[in-house]
A protein has these predicted regions:
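Conserved GNAT-fold acetyl-CoA-binding loop/helix
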Residues: 22-45
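A short beta-loop-alpha structural element at the N-terminal edge
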Residues: 2-17, 25
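A short helix-loop-beta-strand connector motif used in the catalytic cores of GNAT acetyltransferases and
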Residues: 43-57, 89
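Conserved acetyl-CoA-binding loop-helix of GNAT-fold acetyltransferases
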Residues: 92-95, 101-114, 141
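Conserved beta-strand in the GNAT
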Residues: 58, 64-73, 89, 94
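Conserved GNAT acetyl-CoA-binding A-motif
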Residues: 116-127
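Conserved active-site alpha-helix within GNAT-family acetyltransferase domains
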Residues: 106, 118, 130-148
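Conserved beta-strand-loop-alpha-helix junction that forms the acyl-donor binding cleft
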Residues: 125-135, 152-156
Length: 156
């Protein structure tokens, strides 16, 4: 297994994993996520694959997409009260449900940390849905800590 940038022939594997993530989110928040949802379709994925600010890394297990990490490079300059900084935002990280427990997620995460350092980023950030306890535990074990918390008041 090795980590590499995604290619167009990885799209079917990416879509299968996006559906797995969509189901996890749907199970946690059916009031927000649609049934059988996926974050990106084939057209969007083709566009993302050409965007150098949005790298997608895959864990390639003998040609099978065993996991992915969608990233967004962000630069903040002259942003009011905040310091200038560069960040890599993890938009989505998923390991195939049948391949979990093999350290694939850690390999992806560590690869992304190295990539972010190479790009001059000071931070790696992400969001986790409340209730996604396994993701919270994974990121906490990887050394991440909360920066901010999004609050909501449900009105209906």
């Amino acid at each position: 297994m090795f980590i590499r940038l995604a290619q167009s022939n990885d799209i079917p594997g990416l879509i299968a994993l996006l559906r797995q993530v969509g189901q996890v989110h749907r199970d946690i928040r059916p009031d927000i996520f649609r049934d059988r949802c996926q974050k990106y379709d084939e057209t969007a994925l083709l566009q993302l694959l050409t965007d150098e600010t949005r790298p997608i890394f895959v864990a390639d297990d003998q040609g099978f997409v065993a996991g992915y990490c969608f990233c967004i490079l962000r630069s903040y300059q002259n942003d009011g009260a905040m310091q200038d900084r560069a960040e890599l935002y993890i938009d989505d990280l998923c390991v195939d449900e049948n391949r979990r427990g093999r350290h694939i997620g850690s390999a992806l995460y560590n690869h992304v940390l190295s990539y972010a350092r190479e790009k001059g980023c000071q931070f790696v950030t992400l969001n986790v849905w409340q209730g996604n306890d396994s993701a919270m535990k994974f990121y906490e074990n990887a050394g991440m800590t909360p920066r901010s918390i999004t609050m909501e008041a449900k009105l209906c």
